[in-house]
């Protein structure tokens, strides 16, 4: 009779929506149980109602906090089938252990912790390892030599003095961007390989580095080692952090930082030049470039020393040709200028004006030509007007030599020796009147 009732209860199933219940409060979403059996529900598959074979349920103690859970795709809707025999109250539903939840509906750990990678092979934590879950950031501090690969942890950065920068420990950030980075950083650089190069923890003395000397890291104080190059192997080059945007801010992981003084801040570019090995040709070119300003400055100093009042040359050079006449202070640069000047002091005036009645003589021909232009070529003056010397006149002819009419026009065919008819002897002053 009981088996017959159990078959009837197996056939009568009711679908109940569980929207208001959370994943911890809702019983198994793809399982059905019989209230006629033991208090512990026996899960059976919906697709095989009569079958008593059920998958093994994992114990609640098997799930460890912090372990990723397996995600399975399932098309089962968020509905549960319950038998109506023992569901008169909500006690059976609320007292249902959470361990009966199917693995298909358990939320994967990456959905709760987006910081973890999808590659779960790197995140399996041994059970015998001590776990520190007191802090909300759930850091897992394990010794680095136990793992070959490092998983990214965005929530915690170890505060240890022997750690290298993230660019050296993270393979994703150690890809060569410039050609210089490939020579200094090997492709197989990892934290496990670099820990052997670091000196012992006892030899590390914390030192404070100002922002002017080293590029600031995202978090944590920077404590570079104070040991010398002898702590490192001879065939291993010293690793240096280098950023193209701030070339003068570089720090060596194997050399002491030294004291921070204003002089050291002023000489930041010199430290940058010492980080790279300079070729002999480039070093010689740099030395010559630094020497050239000193040579220029020495030349400028010599010129400034020569610019004293005693060493200044005379602005007007002392002329060589002087007039020898007493009382004359004439000075000339050329010999011909002096000869022309000497004619003015002599009594000889060979250049005489040809205008009738003028007879003015000059010692130089240029003075006579100036006399023609200024005296006889203009009307209304005291001197006689000559039309042949006026450039604006129709009778302009500077080479004409002969007799002139009373108004100054030329008489062609006449000569200077000839006398004017019916004119008598008239003076120049009479012509002017």
Curated annotation (Swiss-Prot):
This is C2H2 type master regulator of conidiophore development brlA. One of its GO terms (molecular function) is zinc ion binding. The lineage of its organism: Eukaryota, Fungi, Dikarya, Ascomycota, Pezizomycotina. Pfam families: zf-C2H2. GO terms for biological process: conidium formation; sporulation resulting in formation of a cellular spore. Induction: Expression is regulated by the heterotrimeric G protein pga1. Expression is also positively regulated by stuA. It comes from Penicillium rubens (strain ATCC 28089 / DSM 1075 / NRRL 1951 / Wisconsin 54-1255) (Penicillium chrysogenum). InterPro entries: Znf_C2H2_sf, Znf_C2H2_type. GO terms for cellular component: chromatin; nucleus; transcription regulator complex. BrlA, abaA and wetA are pivotal regulators of conidiophore development and conidium maturation. They act individually and together to regulate their own expression and that of numerous other sporulation-specific genes. Binds promoters of target genes at brlA response elements (BREs) containing the conserved sequence 5'-(C/A)(A/G)AGGG(G/A)-3'. Is not required for penicillin V production. Residues 23-64, 240-265, 391-416 are annotated as: Disordered. It is found in: Nucleus. SMART domains: ZnF_C2H2.
